[in-house]
Curated annotation (Swiss-Prot):
This is Large ribosomal subunit protein uL23. Gene3D superfamilies: 3.30.70.330. GO terms for cellular component: ribonucleoprotein complex; ribosome. Binds to 23S rRNA. One of the proteins that surrounds the polypeptide exit tunnel on the outside of the ribosome. Part of the 50S ribosomal subunit. Contacts protein L29. InterPro entries: Nucleotide-bd_a/b_plait_sf (IPR012677), Ribosomal_uL23-like (IPR013025), Ribosomal_uL23/eL15/eS24_sf (IPR012678), RRM_dom (IPR000504). CDD domains: RRM_SF.
Amino acid sequence: MMLLQTEKALRLLEQYNTITILVPREYTKSKIKEFFEKKGYKVKKVNTLITKKGLKKAYVRFKEEGVARKVAEELGGL
């Protein structure tokens, strides 16, 4: 998993407690949610899409406030 650090991704992080990551195409929403819940984070919602370049992007929204920033720091961003 790779954290995206675009303007939109940072805005989502700050305003909506959501991280934006690139994941392997075979990952499902439930697999992504399970990954973060095993680490002890409560996930509210996962949305995925395939980009024009064929990459899979996931938006992961967390239930608890401020968790997205902590997760982003763990994934090597910010």
